């Protein structure tokens, strides 16, 4: 940022891999924290090997690990244990997403660490939480999407589908990040550290609350409707001449405006099939046919222009490449360069925008790039 970031001077030790924990700690790094990432000796974070699409590097790793220092370490060895002890003695935050039971076997459980380091904040990220029948079960994003019910409400009537991004991991990473910030704020008041856990199932479960409420209290399962909204109509893609336009409504006022100003079908406002949103959802197929009949004479650009003039929300379906060239991002100067071992890459600024301050887009580290420097700093008497 312009000057020191809000977390400048904070030391985070991260024994992490994959997505959830690295997403949390990368956001801490964006705020100025010093993040020391411990990677497995000889292999590193296995996310380094997911693909080679970004100048020979994995897209997930480049996204999630900028601004960190990479230390290659065998944490099971005597030296590895000594290094971890030295790091944690000075750390403010310890984040780990090891396999179930691994932290305890390594002597890195939260209870033991807090007994030795009273101001340390310990964050443990897991698939299903520290107890219960699923505690020891391995968890990956798609599998947690299944267990949380997300696939049951996503896709077409015939085929359930996963979300196109690692939504369970991302959810857990966000809650781990905010959990760390909350614990830091609490430490300012109490002078003591604390520990907390975040599970992928709990994180995604929070996001699945509306479908749960709809199902359990409404007595019916949400429909899988592809790109359409399951409980609001009209809301989704509609075919125009030469392409689709996505339209979204939220209330009866907007419905009346759509009928009058966009469709030129004010008679639909009083049509008993479409009087309320539940009515429109019930008769969605009929309504879709009516809307698309009107839009068939207009190009997508003409439809969007008419929707904009009427104040009705709309969107065009974009690919990732088209998103990267989005005119709104360009107009707001949202792109920066981040260094990687393979060369500079474009990266989006973090979503939180503070006037006069800009997040530091730190470099993505090579495996073990900072090992010797960190060991010399934290174990100055060590002999190689």
Regions found by a protein language model. Give the residues of each.
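Aromatic-enriched alpha-helical interface/lid elements that frame and gate functional surfaces
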Residues: 233-310, 314
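Terminal low-complexity tails and localization/encapsulation signals of metabolic enzymes
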Residues: 1-11, 223, 239-240, 321-384
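Conserved Rossmann-fold dehydrogenase catalytic segment
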Residues: 130, 157-165, 188-204, 223-230, ...
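Glycine-rich beta-alpha junction loops
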Residues: 42, 128-129, 200-205, 242-244, ...
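N-terminal helix-loop segment corresponding to the beta1-alpha1 unit
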Residues: 1-179, 183-189, 301, 338, ...
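Short Gly/Pro-enriched turn/cap motifs at secondary-structure boundaries
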Residues: 61, 225-230, 235-236, 247, ...
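Short, well-structured beta-strand/strand-turn elements
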Residues: 35, 308-322, 381-384
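Oxidoreductase and adenylate-handling cofactor-binding alpha/beta cores
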Residues: 173-193, 206-217, 260-264, 269
